[in-house]
Amino acid sequence: MSRSLKKGPFVADHLLKKIEKLNAKGKKVVIKTWSRSSMIVPPMIGHTIGVYNGREHIPVFVSDQMVGHRLGEFSPTRTYRGHAKKDKKAKR
């Protein structure tokens, strides 16, 4: 179920404050965050946000096409290494 429009998008307060400070100064630095559920809003465009995936912070450069998506969508938590190869020698 999606979030009600009258509530507006969820963005962590600490993350939004950091973005607004950087926009006022005009600086571009990587902002580390653990808030994967925060929605990408227009003030974030052009910033690089380090999104935690459970092991490390993955840098995500925010573009205008990402607005409305969540930060966690761009930081995969699972590593897929492929299925096991067929071992013909083991079958003999």
Swiss-Prot record:
GO BP of this protein: ribosomal small subunit assembly; translation
Give residue spans, biased composition: Basic residues. Answer: 80-92
MF terms from GO for this chain are: rRNA binding; structural constituent of ribosome
Its predominant location is plastid
Q: Mind naming one GO cellular-component term on file for this protein?
A: mitochondrial small ribosomal subunit
Q: Where is this region: Disordered?
A: 73-92
Keywords assigned by UniProt? Chloroplast, Plastid, Ribonucleoprotein, Ribosomal protein, RNA-binding, rRNA-binding
Q: Transmembrane stretches, by residue range?
A: none
Any idea where this protein resides? Plastid, Chloroplast
One matching Pfam family, short form? Ribosomal_S19
InterPro entries per the UniProt record, alphabetical: Ribosomal_uS19, Ribosomal_uS19_bac-type, Ribosomal_uS19_CS, Ribosomal_uS19_SF
Which family does the UniProt entry place this protein in? Belongs to the universal ribosomal protein uS19 family.
Function, in words: Protein S19 forms a complex with S13 that binds strongly to the 16S ribosomal RNA.
What is the name attached to this protein's record? Small ribosomal subunit protein uS19c
What is the source species? Answer: Chlamydomonas reinhardtii
Taxonomic lineage from the root:
Eukaryota, Viridiplantae, Chlorophyta, core chlorophytes, Chlorophyceae
Q: What is the primary gene name for this protein?
A: rps19
